Amino acid sequence: MWILAHVIIAPNSMYLQTRVHGSAGRKMDAAFATLPSDDTVRDKTLVVLQAPNDFTSYYFTLMRSGDALPLPEHTRVLSTGLHPMTIERPGANRLVLRTTDGFIAQRDLSIYRNHKYPMQTGETISITGMTAVVTKADIHGWPMDAVFTFDKSLDDESILWYIGTMAPERNPKTGRKLKVERYFPVPVPAVGETLSIDDLLARSEKYKMAVAAAEAPG
């Protein structure tokens, strides 16, 4: 039994885990390659309005650091999951985000908040350069709507606005069209505007180029 477990099963299991983790790592590398990586980001704040999953901020920082690549001075992921969300800009430095399913995608596995620590309407979180106030929470204490106030105008060049989504892309080897995690720069809404995630992506030149490339004949 010891030989079966340690000589036969364990090495094969380790090989399988390495392949799985390697594949996942390559996918994340490709996704994070669409986030800014030149030296100019070192004094910038990267704001991801929505990321496809809860692990973006953690793995992005970990992988960039491991590869000795430039990191933004601050990274703020405001919501995760591919859920409908509206973004209202009532003032120069303020956003109101409203969701249908909350700000956290994988609630059971979330690295952001444990379900044992529910949030309340009116709860305030302040971090460098930004304050978030929960304006609506569900019965389980998960935030649904929130106001984000920054310490400078949202139009300031030091703030980089991005959205993560599952974008269409053709496999370069097979020509097959896939949905892959990618990040796109988006213009921040104008004061007085209320837009959806799809509205903002539709204003992104890079997103439009990616969609057009995926739709082009192979």
Where is each model-derived feature located?
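Short, solvent-exposed secondary-structure boundary/capping segments
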Residues: 138-151
